[in-house]
Design a protein with these regions (language model features):
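Hydrophobic alpha-helical segments within soluble ligand-binding/sensing domains
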Residues: 86-128, 228-249
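Beta-alpha junction/loop-to-helix N-cap segments that form part of ligand/metal-binding clefts
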Residues: 31-94, 189-204, 208-213
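Extracytoplasmic "Venus flytrap"
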Residues: 1-20, 31-40, 136-140, 189-194
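An alpha-beta-alpha
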Residues: 13, 104-154, 254-270
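Short beta-strand segments enriched in small/hydrophobic residues
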Residues: 1-6, 127-134, 184
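Pocket-lining segment of extracytoplasmic ligand-binding domains
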Residues: 138-210, 214
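Hinge/cleft segment of the Venus flytrap/periplasmic-binding protein
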Residues: 243-307
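Short beta-strand elements in bilobed, periplasmic/extracellular small-molecule ligand-binding domains
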Residues: 19-42, 102-103, 148-166
């Protein structure tokens, strides 16, 4: 899928491999393709990789990683996944410490309860939270259930709305606004991420802050993105690739790399449009975060860096 977080991961994998190649005196021949969430295109891309007899496959995000795993079960081709939220729950690995098969990688597991606490810190009187996600995204399943469990314990009402396409997500956003929610939560859901630029103004106009599981959502207009550093995740993925290809590390015995959550990225334009003061928001968030970053709305991180 063409979204800011996944593009950032790919860019950092490639740049880190170039760096490692120079350090180790080797050249990594990288073939890159993007199926844009089209299952038939994904099948063809993986088939082409197999026909080219690649030494290793890299699957960015859960659906691609799962298909690569099944496609390579009868071969010796290792798979390294990147940005898989729940590697065990999705069946990719037996455990995080010992994957058990010819696959390992990096996880962007989301600490959902921490985002719920951010919502409460910003609005202690919150009474109803909207849960916006794609029911078909494996990466969302665990996080949404964790959100429900947390909100049940806190006695906070929630309403779920889902969508599998941008058009459906827009309708789901409209429904949440009509539901009168005080805030909206979305985990690391690629479908919603792809649609964020088309819905963030709806939430702003309704005065509803959108809390999300990645900084790329905030880049595309959401109020807050919270979670892991995807640039670092991409670099660590490249390190694992090099360990396997150069140092003969065994994927089945190579622990899945996990990362600390804790970085909250606030879109200052959205913050202002919602009638909130950034300094006040930052002060409320800081006890719950390792750092609070600022960002403004753009389509890609490259645009932000070039400003």
């Amino acid at each position: 899928i063409d979204d800011a977080s996944l593009n950032q991961i790919v860019d950092n994998i490639q740049s880190r491999l170039e760096e490692l190649g120079k350090e180790k005196g080797v050249t990594f021949d990288v073939s890159y393709d993007n199926c844009n969430a089209d299952a038939s295109v994904m099948e063809q891309i993986i088939s082409d990789f197999q026909a080219d007899k690649v030494d290793l496959m890299v699957g960015v995000a859960t659906p691609v990683a799962m298909r690569m795993q099944s496609a390579t079960e009868e071969s010796d081709t290792p798979v390294v996944f990147s940005a898989v939220s729940d590697p065990v729950g999705s069946g990719l690995v037996d455990s995080l410490d010992a994957p058990g098969a010819n696959i390992t990688g990096t996880s962007d597991y989301l600490d959902t309860s921490s985002i719920m606490k951010l919502i409460q810190a910003q609005n202690p009187d919150v009474k109803k939270i909207g849960l916006l996600y794609d029911v078909g995204q494996d990466s969302s399943t665990t996080a949404i259930q964790e959100a429900k469990d947390y909100l049940d314990k806190e006695g906070i009402e929630y309403v779920e709305r889902t969508g599998t396409t941008t058009d459906e997500v827009q309708l789901a956003a409209d429904a949440l606004i009509a539901d009168g929610v005080d805030a909206v939560f979305t985990p690391t859901d690629n479908t919603i991420m792809t649609a964020e630029l088309s819905i963030y103004e709806k939430f702003i106009d309704a005065g509803i802050p959108h809390y999300t599981g990645a900084d790329s959502f905030a880049l595309n207009g959401a109020f807050v993105g919270y979670g892991v550093d995807y640039a670092n995740l991409g670099q660590k993925t490249a390190d694992m690739i090099a360990d396997i290809l150069i140092d003969n590390a065994d994927p089945s015995k190579t622990a899945v790399e996990t990362f600390d959550n804790g970085t909250a990225t606030v879109n200052t334009e959205t913050c202002k449009a919602l009638g909130l003061d950034f300094d006040t928001v930052k002060k409320a968030f800081e006890p719950l975060c390792t750092q609070v970053n600022e960002i403004t709305t753009a389509e890609s991180f490259d645009e932000v860096e070039s400003k």
